[in-house]
Amino acid sequence: MSEKLVLIDGHSILNRASFGIPDLTNSEGLHTNAVYGFLNIMFKILEEEQPDYLTVAFDVSEPTFRHKMFAEYKGTRKPMAAELKQQVPLMKEMLRAMGVTIVEKGGYEADDLLGTIAKRSEAAGVEVAVVSGDRDLLQLATDHIKIRIPKTKRTGTEIEDYNAKEVLEKYQVTPTEFIDVKALMGDTSDNIPGVPGIGEKTATAIIAKYGSIENAYVHVDELKPPRASTNLKEHYDMAQMSKTLATIDIDADIAYKLADAHLEQVSDLYTEEAYLLCKRLEFKNLLGRFSVEAPKNTAEEHFKKIEKAQEAEAFFASLRGKACGFYVVPQEETHDAHTEADGQMNLFGSFAMQNSGEEAGQQETAGSCHIPDFLGLAVACGEEEICYVEASEALPCRKIRELFAGSAAASYATLDLKPQLKELGMLEKKCLGTISEENLFDNTIAAYLLNPIKNEYPYEDIAKDYAGLMISSRKDLIEKLTYEKAAEKKPEEFLKCVCYMAYVAYKTREPLEKELADTGMEALFREIEMPLVFTLADMEKEGIIASGEALKEYGDKLAVRIDELERKIYEEAGEEFNINSPKQLGVILFEKLSLPNGKKTKTGYSTAADVLDRLAPDYPIVADILEYRQLTKLKSTYADGLVNYIAEDGRIHTSFNQTITATGRLSSTEPNLQNIPMRIELGRLIRKAFLPKSGFVFVDADYSQIELRVLAHLSGDEKLIEAYRNAQDIHRTTASQVFHIPFDEVTDLQRRNAKAVNFGIVYGISSFGLSQDLSITKKEAAEYIERYFETYPKIKGYLDGLVAEAKEKGYVTTMFGRRRPIPELSSSNFMQRSFGERIAMNSPIQGTAADIIKIAMNRVHDRLLAEGLKSRLILTVHDELLVETAAEEEQEVRKILAEEMHGAAQLSVMLEIDVHAGSDWYQAK
């Protein structure tokens, strides 16, 4: 059997991969999609070909012999996109790490190097596969040289294969004649001129008949159509030059030895160096290809399990005065890597369940919440002192907690502190013996502040980013097993996993602290985010009462209206169909009923909300469909969905997330209470199902127009500041100024439009976006925005300054120092850059508002406790705080909310709040 060589056109495949795969970046901000796509294509080819030799050719950015012949050669090509250009050296680094031979030489294109190597290898009896997205290489095809052209699609990579026979079948010319076709028709991508007036069809017909441009010229008077004859006579010299430009040099002056490209087996590419680079680039899906293990960290040799009380006592005593990292290993019900990156469950969703053994009866001071058992405690206080203290009958959780509380370490670092506070018994107390808020450090929150645009912060990423360590992930070690199952089935891997959690916390605390200080976010971390961990933990523990009966009643009312709408829609359509099927709905609306503006896609007509919103005012069936969608969403998500989250204590215990949004806003999951509808009355009615406990009321405080007030302060615009200081209706004031009409004559519509402009400006709205919101022309919207900036000139200067600063620094900051990186600003894609500019304008405003709300939450939470009140902060939704208030404490709680929320930040305008009380959340709002 003949030996086989695979040749890859480096730049071509990188370029194809970059367009086939959406932009990806790793935590360093490096664009990686082209490299990732290239590797997937290469692995696919190698698995299919199983070659004996492998070589990748790259272009060199200097003129070739073709440029000397024709200065305009490739002159019309756009420069390589910055995102792709950045990845070329990364690609070469990866290939070298794999031991792949790379060829490149000044004066030649990669095509010439590939052609030369392919022909030499064919002559030596080697079968050749050339992989490229460039069809120019089809001229190389023979019975022994196969051209493979990959197409990257969402469903995977498809490859077209061409030997000489396939070229002839598809293009009606031989591979060598393919050059002549290109010489006649030209090539706009390479700026090869060709012959004017001769396109692909005519060129193919001429060459198929005469075999070459030279022979065609001999028979020039016979050429059809006559225009081709005339033009070839006139431009024959250009045709010959075009042929030279299009011809791949198969005798390039390169020193290439086939033996140097030898590949014993494909698995030889999966080197340790390449593995580490894949880890760095965060190609998690590719790591499974590597049989190599992650390089062993020397700390692993010192991972140890402690089972005896005496040994545990000695170990905890040794922590005194040292910096340590720890991790409380929870009893998990399930492990979902997507929702809990570090594998911790939401402990508050089932806090009312009784515990067994010696923990039974131990209660938190604030309520009926028992301190739960845990599997054990991992602690690291040095490179050689990393232990997992396992809980058992001989060494119960109570004893471990007691020893840990008295350890008197200098500092305690951990990953994702909030879920561990319950096991430590630190809810509402903020301390456990010698462990307190002051000496605790949450590495996950620190990593989030330093790079808030990541999706998750698993321990292996934190280790890599802040300690330069490449370590095995939880998934690598124990797959999808819970900790309890892993301890039973994979004890060694389990020990590594939990010890790494503690070790990474210990190892990365100092570099994280240094980076926080260097970036000016130390105060943000210490004074806002760390106290918030305790605030949120207490709120999760408290939860909020949800009436299953009220939710059912609400759902039943929705069901009646949904049934009415369904019948009405069928009647209007003249037939029954699946209203929830976009395909069927599109056919009904745009074919049967012939509604205008139907946008047909590959899967059918678009029935997206923006399409239907424009039709609803004129077509009752569309208005009914929109209402139907709204009500079915309310029923499934809230009326039916929320019931599943009611715990045994009758409360819903949502999980608040501190490390999800790039702006610093909080989010919540299981369930998401941030999205409780507010715009429509039917949505607001859901709040009736949320109740205070007996003898209590809800007191709700909501910041009024906080983002606009922040904008007034940050921009320093005197008119906006004056309007707020005079307690004017800001939207009516804006309408009066923008539309040049007296304040008292502003109509409701004008006020509504001004409100859309006011809030739109905060989010960097474009004239197109505003035109869509207000159903006006783009020109009118642009005029509104222009007049707005004329009215408030300093706002325009401020927003422009934010964009300029972001372009220079790569990030923007809030009033409290929170950073928001904006990689989109360096994109070559206009839409991405425009999106980046909107982020630059909005993030400092939205982020500052988020910081203020967090400060207010901490202050309200702490003051309720400090004053010994029974009332508790239980929920936050955007700019709103909800306190479950003892009836006799209502006035005091109102006072606390007003003082602490007003005082959360000192702005040039007052932070106003609206405070209401009620017997359910609806009434309180």
Residue ranges: model-predicted function:
Residues A380-E383, Y412, D416, L450-L481, ...:
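Function-dense linear segments that define catalytic or interfacial modules
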Residues L5-V6, R16-T55, A71-E72, T76-E83, ...:
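Conserved RNase H-like, two-metal-ion catalytic cores of nucleic-acid enzymes
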Residues H235-A391, A487-M678, L691, V697, ...:
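Conserved "right-hand" nucleotidyltransferase catalytic core of DNA-directed polymerases
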Residues S18, E72-Q86, D143-V173, S229-N231, ...:
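Short alpha-helix plus adjacent loop in nuclease-associated cores
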